[in-house]
Structure formats: C-alpha cells, structure tokens
Amino acid sequence: MKDFLLCTDLDRTLIPNGSHPLSPGAIEQFKQLVSLKEATLTYVTGRHRALIEQAISNFDLPRPDFVIADVGTTIYRINASEWQHWDEWDSEIAPDWRGLAHDDISNLLKDFPVLSLQEAEKQNLHKLSFYVPLQTNVSRLIGDINTKLKQSDIKANLIWSIDEEAKIGLLDVLPISANKLHAIRFLMNKQGYTHGNTVFSGDSGNDLDVLLSDIPAVLVANADAEVRKSVAEADTATLYIAKGGFLGMNGNYSAGIIEGVAHYLPEIDTWLREQNLAK
C-alpha cells in the first residue's frame, strides 16, 4: 500500500454537526483508515487552534499530522501533542502584504470606525478578523478597504460572513494567496505528495477552491444544495460526489470521506472491504 495524504474540512465534513444523520460506525472506520502507517491526516479549517483542539476533544477525532487553520493563514505540524507553527508558510504568503503583519494592516485600517477587532485568539500574523454591524453597507465597505490597501500595494482577500446567532457581521482580511488550495499545494510539495496519492474532502462554499481544482476531491453526501449545484455545473473530472451505499453507509460526513478515498485509491478500497468482511 502506498503512502497517501488525506486533507479534510472539519465542520459538517468530518464533524457530524449538520442536520443529516451519521452512519453508525463511520467515525470508527475513519479512525481505522487514518491509523494506517501510510496515512498522513491533515485538517483544513477556518477554525483557530483552540477551537480545533476543542473539536478534537468533543468529537473524539483522531489527532492529525498537520493542521491548516485560520482560513489558510496558518499551518501546524503535530508531533505527539505538540503543535509546531510552520514558519515557512508565513514566509510563503508574506510577500502579499510586502512583509507587513497584523498590526501594520490594522493601523492602515484605523480610519474605518465600523471595524472592531475580534478577540485575540481569532487574530494571527497574517489574519485580521473584525466585527461589523449588520446595518453597514458591506459592498461599499469592502470596496473602500480594498482601495485603501491597494494604495499601499497590499494584496488582500476580504472574506465576509454573518454570525446569525450573535447577529453581527464578520470580516476577515488575509493575504490574497492565503487559502485552503494554496496551503494544500504547499503541503503536498513540501511533503512529496502528488495528485496520485492526495485526496481532499469538503462540504461547503468555503471548500470550492479545492473541490473545483485538479486535486482529487470528494464532496460528502450531506453537502449544501448550492455547493452541489455549483460542482454539477463545473463538471470537473477530479471531483467525486459521495452517493452512499459504500460498505452500507450513507455517504454523510466521515462515511463520505471514506467512500471518496476508496474511489481514488484502489488499494484502500480493497483494504476497507477486507476489514469489513473480517468483522
């Protein structure tokens, strides 16, 4: 069996925190899969470290080998229980901001009174996260921020979302090259993985850049309807949509991840079926 890299989103992909049911035994089979010595497991998530560790504890998730966190702005190597910040990734994305960091960019945006910095744990060297009142004209705000940053030759990606529960807007300011796809490619290159032994799994619009790339990917069966529509229109050859039925499971969450890995890696398909028969 050859070595393989499995990169997966967390919320509603590996973590069964959506409205769809989880197949009994699916997470146990996932743990068995990633415990193989040939497997390198990477979590790819918008969560920051504390929330990732909380999820690992709350949902009894396997400890990964790598974590791509904070919407692609941070990469960690995990050795035993030690999280090692991968400084080389910081150097990779730093040129987008001309070597400037969090506090420098924050100072550039000090003239926007509607921006309130989020808590310290939601910030990092290359990520500014703000709260924004919902009554704000968001398109104008984003346009004005982009104009301000371009005046300083800062190449940034602005990500807008809404915290429905708290009724507040959320705005992330990131280097333009800090994203899931670039981070996964960086990891593949540094660790010697190819398209022939890498699989990504996701469920939402935040995963589309990878799902629609040339990296083999699986969309779990519980994915958002809008995402399913987007990928259907794209008709990419390197995307597998979990259907359910593999090993009697429904294709949701970890069951869909397993189904997708088996689709791309025949040796894993054979191994999983043998393990299932042995039960």
Give the residues covered by each predicted segment.
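The start of beta-strands in P-loop NTPase/AAA+ ATPase cores
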Residues: 4-6, 65, 198
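A short acidic/small-residue loop/turn micro-motif
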Residues: 22-24, 222
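Active-site phosphate-binding/coordination module
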Residues: 24-119
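Conserved acidic, metal-coordinating active-site core of Asp-based
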Residues: 108-199, 204-213
